[in-house]
Amino acid sequence: GLSVLLGATQLVKNPLITLDVYSSCEVYGKQFFDQNDHEYTELYEQARKLPNVNYIGYKPNSFIKSNMHKYNMYAYPSIFEETSCISLLECMAGGLYSITTNLGALFETGAEFPMYIPFDNDLRRLSMKFAAAIEASANILHEETIHKHLETQSNYVNAYYNWNKIGTSWTRFLTGAISAKTK
């Protein structure tokens, strides 16, 4: 997905739009980092060289969440069939306008709130779609209807996807499953 996002960023014409990239194999642990990070070196270097991109790399989740208020938008051109997406939920909870693909369960995760870009196996074409979506979205972020949309989105995610509620649901499910098995 990062290659798609960097491609899109190169197509964005608005000089006020910048991309901060928090991407690294380090998020998956030292062993994964050691085995896989070299595969992404060129991509990270490309991000460092682009004029409208700030390559930040790995930062702990707490850092990202505490700095989320500095951002307006979350662009996530997933090219994998995700079963859920915690970063999408956290950005939605933080009130960021979100753009993502409709691949896998991202539509179920984001409900009606994000702008969904139809997935395209042609990643160049997908980059073009994302560039257009980013530019169009940047032009409407100031509108009152968007502010209300983002407030509703944040309230929705905080009500239905908070960890206490999820933990309670799993506890009930597992208790029931264990109880049914022991009968």
Q: Which sequence ranges carry the predicted segments?
A:
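A conserved mid-protein helix/loop that constitutes part of the nucleotide-sugar donor-binding site
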Residues: G1-L11
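Nucleotide-activated donor-binding/catalytic signature segment of Leloir-type glycosyltransferases, i.e.
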Residues: S23-C25, F33-S62
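Short alpha-helical donor nucleotide-sugar binding micro-motif in glycosyltransferases
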Residues: Y58, S66-Y71
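Short alpha-helical segment that forms part of, or immediately flanks, the ligand-binding pocket
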Residues: K65, L88-A93, G104-E108
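Short hydrophobic beta-strand element within catalytic cores of glycosyltransferases
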Residues: Y97-T100
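A charged, aromatic-enriched C-terminal amphipathic alpha-helix characteristic of glycosyltransferases
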Residues: R125, L141-T182
